[in-house]
Swiss-Prot record:
Hydrolase as UniProt keyword: no
GO biological process assignments: one-carbon metabolic process; S-adenosylmethionine biosynthetic process
Organism of derivation: Legionella pneumophila subsp. pneumophila (strain Philadelphia 1 / ATCC 33152 / DSM 7513)
Subcellular location(s) per record: Cytoplasm
Protein name: S-adenosylmethionine synthase
Residues at which ATP binds: H16, D165, A166, K167, R231, F232, D240, R246, K247, K267
Region feature Flexible loop, mapped onto this chain: 100-110
Lineage: Bacteria, Pseudomonadati, Pseudomonadota, Gammaproteobacteria, Legionellales
Role: Catalyzes the formation of S-adenosylmethionine (AdoMet) from methionine and ATP. The overall synthetic reaction is composed of two sequential steps, AdoMet formation and the subsequent tripolyphosphate hydrolysis which occurs prior to release of AdoMet from the enzyme.
Gene assigned in the entry: metK
Amino acid sequence: MNEVYVFTSESVSEGHPDKIADQISDAILDAILAQDPKARVACEVLVKTGMVLVGGEITTKAWVDVEEITRHVIKDIGYNSSQMGFDWESCAVLSAIGKQSPDIAQGVDNQQTKILGAGDQGLMFGYASRETDVFMPAPIAYAHRLMEKLAKARKSGQLPWLRPDAKCQLTLKYEQGMPVEVDTVVFSTQHSPDIEHKDLVEAIREEIIKSVLPAEWLNDKTRYFINPTGRFVIGGPLGDCGLTGRKIIVDTYGGMARHGGGCFSGKDPSKVDRSAAYAARHVAKNIVAAGLADKCELQISYAIGVAEPTSIFVDTFGTGRLKNSEIIDLIHTHFDLTPQGIIDQHDLLRPIYRQTATYGHYGRESFPWERLDKVAELSKAL
């Protein structure tokens, strides 16, 4: 690809209302899996001024204190004062949790064959490319790093006027399919009322943006829009309602790859919306790392109650060193994409999900689906 183009992705902070909901959902999931790895969990959360509503379907032998977990997450994020419009100590926590439908359960847990079927029908995508060291698209990878840096500056006291809610949007210029320049940075962060706008703009540009983005990508043409409305004091759940699963593009590839539509947070690994999307990322990343292609997008689909995928599709965008059909044959040979196979290979019945709920589910080496454990086998096909 020789054309010049720009591409934009966004990330949001851990204090963004939708991300508060995601973190509570996954914290509850982790607490349950720690006691009962075979639990069935679909936990949804709504947050608004002074209130958290936890709902969903949960079938488990475990007992967890939903209210305590919820308050701990809110405290950890940093909503610790009613002056922010949300306070971990005083907010109401309401619960509306039921059990998994027996009609769904009988399809997922086949008692005759002992085979774990997919928890629902659906289609999932995985993607990888060579444009960053973590095989992720650069716009979303660096947008996440900006949000992580902001959180560290807030929690360490480096920038004491910061508050938890924030988001950024990064537009990169591409040449020959690789990022070469930052075109635009949009950065909005909640703040205390006593910081002057010009001081905030300078601090964010110098101490956050320029400390994260490669210096060679920044120049006098780079555009910065930092708190462009001039004031962002009212934020978090006071400013906007938050819901689990509303940041699925932030959670994945920033729009660079397609998305099957299912969210991740609050779902146990029997839900292929989550586990098969992780598996698809694992497959795509190993294909690219093995040199079979410079870019790879993989689609998998499932039928409820059926273990084997109903389809596998691969697109290497003209960068493949093998035919797409040959890569699909390698996937069938080297990867078990049944729900049980995915769970076993990545050891997913563990309390590992709270950490995925912020700064993306991909691109961090601590996650088991990021392992490059199939590269040696796949590279033999070249």
